[in-house]
Amino acid sequence: METPAWPRVPRPETAVARTLLLGWVFAQVAGASGTTNTVAAYNLTWKSTNFKTILEWEPKPVNQVYTVQISTKSGDWKSKCFYTTDTECDLTDEIVKDVKQTYLARVFSYPAGNVESTGSAGEPLYENSPEFTPYLETNLGQPTIQSFEQVGTKVNVTVEDERTLVRRNNTFLSLRDVFGKDLIYTLYYWKSSSSGKKTAKTNTNEFLIDVDKGENYCFSVQAVIPSRTVNRKSTDSPVECMGQEKGEFREIFYIIGAVVFVVIILVIILAISLHKCRKAGVGQSWKENSPLNVS
């Protein structure tokens, strides 16, 4: 008859070893969970107009913060927006130093309140941005029609350049200053009474176009860099019309006329009042100086 097998009682040294092993496992799990709670940034996107440049990313932080670094291909990394809870970082001051360079940025993720913590590879989680060349990729800002003047059957239209955040000798440069002849303007113009548009192009800031005498025209302009493959065109400028300008002068004329009319009325009223006062004063004086009748 076989003796029943009883559960084995562990020896003291075996129990200690198992306890130590279990503690080590818990420590690893806790460390791993701390790392897992820090999420790497994603969807890094450059947003740039007239060289005002902001890097955006996701996700909104939960118990974590971000730091951004930027570099040229041959340069050193520079840290910006330290330990921020924002999901964007303004990098304009770096990229305007040389807008023809190609830049790369990266976003580091840190646990909130423990920025010294690193990932499993011995460094914080991070994600790289796409490469960005401002001269080739920044969006062109909306231009403005500065003025237009008609002489006979010719109209001279002048475009006002947008200012950029690129500086030279402590002066902000215009789009024309930065892009030179790479920048052209396209003018769209049409009769106020018609929807048919005509176009004209120039690599300066002025247009001289032929128009029909006696007709009012409307204008809109667009900035274009033909050599680009992306972001070639700006949005159209606000529409300006010749009739609107005449209407403004007419409105000013009416206002001035109304003011003059009111002033004339006030002068007349004042003159009548003064005349009545003088007449009343003369009558009173005559009565006072008249001799009394003695009966």
UniProtKB/Swiss-Prot annotation:
- As annotated in Swiss-Prot or TrEMBL, what is the tissue specificity of this protein? Lung, placenta and pancreas.
Indicate which residues form the motif WKS motif.
Answer: 46-48, 77-79, 190-192
Named from the GO MF annotations, one term is: protease binding
For this protein, the record's InterPro entries field holds: FN3_dom, FN3_sf, Ig-like_fold, Interferon/interleukin_rcp_dom, Tissue_factor, Tissue_Factor_CS, Type-II_Cytokine-TF_Rcpt
Induction statement: TF expression is highly dependent upon cell type. TF can also be induced by the inflammatory mediators interleukin 1 and TNF-alpha, as well as by endotoxin, to appear on monocytes and vascular endothelial cells as a component of cellular immune response.
Q: What does this protein do?
A: Initiates blood coagulation by forming a complex with circulating factor VII or VIIa. The [TF:VIIa] complex activates factors IX or X by specific limited proteolysis. TF plays a role in normal hemostasis by initiating the cell-surface assembly and propagation of the coagulation protease cascade.
Describe its assembly: Interacts with HSPE; the interaction, inhibited by heparin, promotes the generation of activated factor X and activates coagulation in the presence of activated factor VII.
PANTHER family linked to this entry: INTERFERON/INTERLEUKIN RECEPTOR (PTHR20859), TISSUE FACTOR (PTHR20859:SF22)
Q: What is this protein called?
A: Tissue factor
